[in-house]
C-alpha cells in the first residue's frame, strides 16, 4: 500500500489528528490601537494621497517616449550609413529597413510572420541581380541578418518596453517614406562615386551607340607614354565643350571632337594627337583644366592602331556634321582605310627586309627585329612583318642571309678595297698628325713603321704579325684597339684557348688582334700557332662545320713581354715585327688623351699614306677606284609599260 502523501513514517501509530496550542498576544481588556479598530468609521481620508498626480510622472513618460523615438532614428541613421558604404547590398538593406519599421509599427505581426520570414528572405536574395563579384549571395544574406539582429530586434524591444501608444506608431509610419527616399539617394551617390568609370561607359554607349572600349586598347600603367589618345568626358558644360575646339589647338597636331548631350550635360569623344608623347596622368591633368571637370569623370586610353573597323569609324564620322576635325589625319587611319595600303599590308617580302638590313649593316638578330619593327608606320612591308605569326623565324632567316652576303662581300675584297670601303663609311674631318705624333713620342721612326705596316697589311710571310710591347700604361692597347675598330677586325682572347673554336672569328676578319699576351700565351703560340704568325694557310675548327682552311689574316699583338728578343721563345723572333712603347701615355689636365686617335683620324692617315702603303691595285687604276659595285638582293620593280 502506498504511503500517504505528505506523511513520514506511516503505520507507526499516527491517527491523523494533532493538537495546536494558540498563541495569545492580547488579553481581554487591553487597549486597541486606532489602526486595528474595526468599529471605526471608514471615511476614505487616508487614500487621498495614494495616487500621485504630480508632473513628474508625465515628464518621465515623455522622456521615455523621446528616448524610444531617438532610438528609432539612430537605427535608421545607422542603416543608411551601411547602405551608403556597401552599394551591392543596397536593395537588401532597403527591404530590411522596411521590415524593421513595419515590425516596430506593428508588434503583433512579428510573431505571426516569424515562421515565414526565412523563406521570404531567401526568395528576395535569389531575385537580386548578381553584381559580377564572387560570394554575392552569401555576403548579402549575412548583411540582412546583421541588419535585422542589430536594428530590428533592438528597436522592437525598445518600443515594447517604452510603453508608447499610438503616437509612437504614427511617427514610425511617417518615417517609412523618408527612410526609403534617403536610401535611394545614397544609392545614387554610391553609384556615381564608387563606379564612375562604368557609369561613364554606360552613358557613352547610350549616347553614341558604340562601346568606348571597342575603340581603344587599354594601358595598365598610367606612366606609359603615347602621342595618340582617345578621351571621353562626362558632365561637361555646353559652353566649355564649344571652347575646347579652340583651346586644344595649341597642344595638338590632330583633333577629332564629337559632342552629344546626356542627362548630366555634354559627353564628348575626342581623338587627339599631341605634339609630343604624354602619359595618362599628364593628359588627365591637361583635360581636367580645359574641361573644368574632375579627372574621375574622364576615361582616357590610346586608340587601336591596327583595327580596320576602328579606323573606318574615325574616317566615316570625320565626314559627318557631328565631328569637328582639325589637323592632318594620322597615318594609321590612312593606312587602314586606303585600298592600296590594305593590299600591300598583306604581302611580306623577305628580300626587301634582307636588303634593308644589308644597307644598314645590321647583322644581329635583335637589332634587325627592333629597328625594322619601328618602320611599321611608314613601311608596308614592315607592317606586314608585324602582322606575321612567324616573326622569330623571319628575323632569324634575315640575319642569316645578311651575314652570308656580308661575309661573301668581305672575302671578295682585297685589303685595299676593304680599307677604302671603311673610309667611305667614315665621316671626314679627321687629322692624321696625332697618330704620327704618338709614334714619335714613343721614339718610333715613322718611316720604319710605315714600311713594316705596309708588309703587315699585305700579309707577307714572316711579316704579317706585329707586336707592340712595353711597360704598362703606355698606350699599346689604345693604339691597337683604335685600328681594329676602324677596320672592323676581330679580337680573340687567350682565355678561351682551351676551346676548339677560339680562333673561329679569324675566318671572317680582314685583321685580327690578341691583346695583352702573357708568357703562358706566348708558350701556347710558340707551340701551336707558328704557321699562323707566318701568314700561311691554317686549319680552323668552326662550329657546325668541317675544318675550314684559310689564310690567317694579319695579327696585331700587344704585350708587356718582348717575345721578339726573349730566349724562351727563339722560334718567334723571326716571325714578329716589334715596336716598343716605352713612355707613359700622356693626358691633359682634364684627363683627355693628348694624342686622340679615332676613326676620322685613321681615315685621314690612310688617305695621306695611301700610295706609300701601296694599296692601289691594277683594277683600281683602271676604274679610278670605282670597282666596288652596289649589292642588290631584292628584285627591282619594272615601271615600264608593256607597249614600250
From Swiss-Prot:
A motif (Nuclear localization signal) lies at residues 86-88. The lineage of its organism: Viruses, Monodnaviria, Shotokuvirae, Cossaviricota, Papovaviricetes. Phosphorylated. Sumoylated. InterPro entries: Helicase_SF3_DNA-vir (IPR014015), P-loop_NTPase (IPR027417), PPV_DNA_helicase_E1_C (IPR001177), PPV_DNA_helicase_E1_N (IPR014000), PPV_E1_DBD (IPR046832), PPV_E1_DBD_sf (IPR046935), Rep_E1_papillomaV (IPR016393), Znf_lg_T-Ag_D1_dom_sf (IPR037102). Keywords: ATP-binding, DNA replication, DNA-binding, Early protein, Helicase, Host nucleus, Hydrolase, Isomerase, Isopeptide bond, Nucleotide-binding, Phosphoprotein, Ubl conjugation. The gene is E1. Belongs to the papillomaviridae E1 protein family. ATP binds at residues 470-477. GO terms for biological process: DNA replication. GO terms for cellular component: host cell nucleus. ATP-dependent DNA 3'-5' helicase required for initiation of viral DNA replication. It forms a complex with the viral E2 protein. The E1-E2 complex binds to the replication origin which contains binding sites for both proteins. During the initial step, a dimer of E1 interacts with a dimer of protein E2 leading to a complex that binds the viral origin of replication with high specificity. Then, a second dimer of E1 displaces the E2 dimer in an ATP-dependent manner to form the E1 tetramer. Its EC number is 5.6.2.4. This is Replication protein E1. It catalyses: Couples ATP hydrolysis with the unwinding of duplex DNA by translocating in the 3'-5' direction; ATP + H2O = ADP + phosphate + H(+).
Amino acid at each position: 500500500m502506498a504511503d500517504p502523501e505528505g506523511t513520514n513514517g506511516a503505520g507507526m501509530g499516527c491517527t491523523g489528528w494533532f493538537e495546536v496550542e494558540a498563541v495569545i498576544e492580547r488579553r481581554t481588556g487591553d487597549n486597541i490601537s486606532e489602526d486595528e479598530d474595526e468599529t471605526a468609521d471608514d471615511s476614505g481620508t487616508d487614500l487621498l494621497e495614494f495616487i500621485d498626480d504630480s508632473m513628474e510622472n508625465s515628464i518621465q513618460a515623455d522622456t521615455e517616449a523621446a528616448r524610444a523615438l531617438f532610438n528609432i532614428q539612430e537605427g535608421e541613421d545607422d542603416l543608411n550609413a551601411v547602405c551608403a558604404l556597401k552599394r551591392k547590398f543596397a536593395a537588401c538593406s532597403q527591404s530590411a529597413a522596411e521590415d524593421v519599421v513595419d515590425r516596430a509599427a506593428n508588434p503583433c505581426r512579428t510573431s505571426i510572420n516569424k515562421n515565414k520570414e526565412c523563406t521570404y528572405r531567401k526568395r528576395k536574395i535569389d531575385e537580386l541581380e548578381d553584381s559580377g563579384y564572387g560570394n554575392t549571395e552569401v555576403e548579402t544574406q549575412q548583411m540582412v541578418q546583421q541588419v535585422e539582429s542589430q536594428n530590428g530586434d533592438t528597436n522592437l524591444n525598445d518600443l515594447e518596453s517604452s510603453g508608447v501608444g499610438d503616437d509612437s506608431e504614427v511617427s514610425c509610419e511617417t518615417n517609412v517614406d523618408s527612410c526609403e527616399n534617403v536610401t535611394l539617394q545614397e544609392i545614387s551617390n554610391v553609384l556615381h562615386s564608387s563606379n564612375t568609370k562604368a557609369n561613364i561607359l554606360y552613358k557613352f554607349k547610350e549616347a553614341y551607340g558604340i562601346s568606348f572600349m571597342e575603340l581603344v586598347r587599354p594601358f595598365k600603367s598610367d606612366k606609359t607614354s603615347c602621342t595618340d589618345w582617345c578621351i571621353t568626358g562626362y558632365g561637361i558644360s555646353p559652353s566649355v565643350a564649344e571652347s575646347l575646339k579652340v583651346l586644344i589647338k595649341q597642344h595638338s597636331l590632330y583633333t577629332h571632337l564629337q559632342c552629344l548631350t546626356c542627362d548630366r550635360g555634354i559627353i564628348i569623344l575626342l581623338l587627339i594627337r599631341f605634339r609630343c608623347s604624354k602619359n595618362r596622368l599628364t593628359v588627365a591633368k591637361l583635360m581636367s583644366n580645359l574641361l573644368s571637370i574632375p579627372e574621375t569623370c574622364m576615361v582616357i586610353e590610346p586608340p587601336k592602331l591596327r583595327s580596320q573597323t576602328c579606323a573606318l569609324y574615325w574616317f566615316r564620322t570625320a565626314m559627318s556634321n557631328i565631328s569637328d576635325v582639325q589637323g592632318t589625319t594620322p597615318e594609321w587611319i590612312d593606312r587602314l582605310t586606303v585600298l592600296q595600303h590594305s593590299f600591300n599590308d598583306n604581302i611580306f617580302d623577305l628580300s626587301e627586309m634582307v636588303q634593308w638590313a644589308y644597307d644598314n649593316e645590321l647583322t644581329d638578330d635583335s637589332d634587325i627585329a627592333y629597328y625594322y619593327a619601328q618602320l611599321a608606320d611608314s613601311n608596308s612591308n614592315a607592317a606586314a612583318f608585324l602582322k606575321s605569326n612567324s616573326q622569330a623565324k623571319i628575323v632569324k632567316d634575315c640575319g642569316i642571309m645578311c651575314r652570308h652576303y656580308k661575309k661573301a662581300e668581305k672575302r671578295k675584297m682585297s685589303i685595299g678595297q676593304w680599307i677604302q670601303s671603311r673610309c667611305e663609311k667614315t665621316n671626314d674631318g679627321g687629322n692624321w698628325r696625332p697618330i704620327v705624333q704618338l709614334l714619335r713620342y714613343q721614339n718610333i721612326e715613322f718611316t720604319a713603321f710605315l714600311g713594316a705596316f705596309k708588309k703587315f697589311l699585305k700579309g707577307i710571310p714572316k711579316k704579317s704579325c706585329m707586336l707592340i710591347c712595353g711597360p704598362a700604361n703606355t698606350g699599346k692597347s689604345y693604339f691597337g684597339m683604335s685600328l681594329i675598330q676602324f677596320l672592323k677586325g676581330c679580337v680573340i682572347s687567350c682565355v678561351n684557348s682551351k676551346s676548339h673554336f677560339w680562333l673561329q672569328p679569324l675566318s671572317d676578319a680582314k685583321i685580327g688582334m690578341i691583346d695583352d699576351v702573357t708568357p703562358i700565351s706566348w708558350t701556347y703560340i710558340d707551340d701551336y700557332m707558328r704557321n699562323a704568325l707566318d701568314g700561311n694557310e691554317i686549319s680552323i675548327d668552326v662550329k657546325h662545320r668541317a675544318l675550314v682552311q684559310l689564310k690567317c689574316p694579319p695579327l696585331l699583338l700587344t704585350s708587356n713581354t718582348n717575345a721578339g728578343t726573349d730566349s724562351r721563345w727563339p722560334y718567334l723572333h723571326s716571325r714578329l715585327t716589334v715596336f716598343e712603347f716605352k713612355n707613359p701615355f700622356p693626358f691633359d689636365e682634364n684627363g683627355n688623351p693628348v694624342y686622340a686617335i679615332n676613326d676620322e683620324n685613321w681615315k685621314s692617315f690612310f688617305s695621306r699614306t695611301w700610295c706609300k702603303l701601296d694599296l692601289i691595285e691594277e683594277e683600281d687604276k683602271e676604274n679610278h677606284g670605282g670597282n666596288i659595285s652596289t649589292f642588290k638582293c631584292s628584285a627591282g620593280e619594272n615601271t615600264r609599260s608593256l607597249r614600250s
